[in-house]
């Protein structure tokens, strides 16, 4: 995929699989809701989660998004990234509101802000800065494999 196609694909998809390096050498994979901000993938999660502990120890992570059921429909993006863990409460609240706008369409108003503010106290924001991006789109193969 071109850079533009990758950007559109990231906007279309809803869940990213985040792989971090676990404490015993095994990959730790978890699904995350996300938002693309200035070309970086951002997510939030509980501050005490295993993925945060893993990223505290080793900031490298791999993100993968994919779609398609039949071989000729498969599309995806894999992003090798460095993660920054943001712990600033106001930044987390701001990001949480942005995340809710994406995933809870129509959720606005003071009750949403109160809910986000409450959740933000237990969360961190994760910013994934791409080092390398790989993508595939089997629809472009035209049935020739």
Each predicted region: which residue ranges?
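Extreme N-terminal tail/first-helix region
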Residues: 1-15, 145
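Short beta-strand segments
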Residues: 14-47, 55, 62-66
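Charged, gly/pro-rich active-site loop segments
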Residues: 71-145
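Catalytic cores of transferase enzymes with a strong primary signal for eukaryotic protein kinases
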Residues: 4-6, 48, 64, 125
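Structured helix-beta-strand junction loops
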Residues: 12-13, 57-58, 122
């Amino acid at each position: 995929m071109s850079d533009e196609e990758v950007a559109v694909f990231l906007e279309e998809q809803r869940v990213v699989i985040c792989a971090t390096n676990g404490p015993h050498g095994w990959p730790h994979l978890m699904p995350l809701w996300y938002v693309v901000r200035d070309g970086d993938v951002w997510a939030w999660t509980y501050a005490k989660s295993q993925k945060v502990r893993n990223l505290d120890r080793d900031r490298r992570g791999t993100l993968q998004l994919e779609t398609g059921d039949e071989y000729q429909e498969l599309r995806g993006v894999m992003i090798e990234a460095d993660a920054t863990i943001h712990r600033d409460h106001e930044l987390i609240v701001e990001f949480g509101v942005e995340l809710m706008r994406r995933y809870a369409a129509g959720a606005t108003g003071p009750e949403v802000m109160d809910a986000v503010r409450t959740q933000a106290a237990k969360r961190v924001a994760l910013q994934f800065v791409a080092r390398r991006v790989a993508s595939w789109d089997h629809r472009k193969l035209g049935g020739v494999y």
